[in-house]
Amino acid sequence: MATSALDDVVLIASAAKDSHIVAFDARTGAVVKQYVAKDGAAALCVSNCERIIAIAPDKRAMTTHGVDKESLERASVLPERPSAVCASRDGAYVASGSASGTCAVWEARSGRLLARFKAHFKGVTTMTFTPCGSALVTGGEDGAVHAWRVSALCDDGGAGTRANAWRSWTEHALGVSGVTCGSVAGAGGDVSVVSCSADRTCKIYSLGNGTTLRQVRCPTALTCCALDACEATLYAGGVDGRVFEIPLNGAPSVAASLDGGIDARDGMVALVGHSKKLVSVRCSSDGNSIISASEDGTARVWDVASRQTLHILRHPKAPISDIALIPRSRYSGQGRGDYGADRKRAKTLPAPTFSKFLIGPGDRSGLKPWQGTSVSISGISKKRAVDASQTVVHDDAPTTSGAVDDDARAALAKKSTELDRARAEVEEWKKLYGDLKSLVDRQLVDAP
């Protein structure tokens, strides 16, 4: 059963100093937990409903909190100061972008750095994974939106090489401020990608064939966007504090816009309530509610049907920098069906330290003996005991080590002979080349 926003816990982060990441119950507006973040959080994401990953403002650091623990679990130092962060829905990958336009992808369980590549000419402003986790979508200050195949980025054989974008869209006139992906897959696994920009437009693309499906122009510069579960409505946040509700299933006829222009789409509605720029918009899974956050220090839970504010969630320290959603069953331990039971029985491993060094292509494993997650094989201790009891050492048993050494020496001698023969041929060809050059010089160059 899909969870609505009223069954979700809203994580609200602030970039202010000594401000915590506060978890609110969207149903009652009560504070559920406060996660320690001494330096604040410029952006955050949730990995598999188990860990909260945040980036510290003005620092080359990325922090990890367990959902069940309020204290900081792990802090990782990065090569550059991150400007955006995201995690795949299945919790397999974590990615970050920096102001230099560089992106990095880690394996979430071990912290191994899988790829580090130049994604944009200018800074990376926003990024997200597709619902299946097979592609990473990034947006930058250069106005470009790129989609990258995770399988190509994480290929060990291609480590250290320049990455090539799978899909690229460069239709925005100004920097991209937000990207999101639809949760409904079309034919062949096609996914809709939406981007918004300070040029007041939202653009909808097809990830399958790379075409631009639609463009919607709004009355003001946009900062964030979100799609509902059915991809029937697009929500975009503006710098003036308004949330624009844009129906996508209606006819794209041109009508008068909210500010008197002629380039808005018919049926656009503005949700008014915030007094400052919006920083994030999130949709519930069933599409009944949306949650918007603003720099005015408040997050509002809106009812989609009535377009009224249900709750106002206030962070102790403004401005708000980002929000994320976690199912409330993850906190209460009383899930619906098997979901809550699995979560209650599961034991999470310690949070890894995200590496800042990329393993070269020569090392296929990419892990040192002390790195990576622990692997437990049931029954291995019993098998070792049985093998040890059945092992008998015979000192007089014949061995084949001498024969193996003789074969190795013979193979080495053969290779050495072939090498000497090749070197002799090279010297012979050099001599022939020198004689030919001397002949040409005498007959053609020095001839009267």
Task: Give short role names for the model-derived ranges.
Residues 10, 52-53, 94, 136, ...:
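Hydrophobic beta-strand positions that form the internal "hydrophobic ladder"
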Residues 149-159, 247-258:
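Short loop/turn segments immediately following beta-strands, especially the blade-tip
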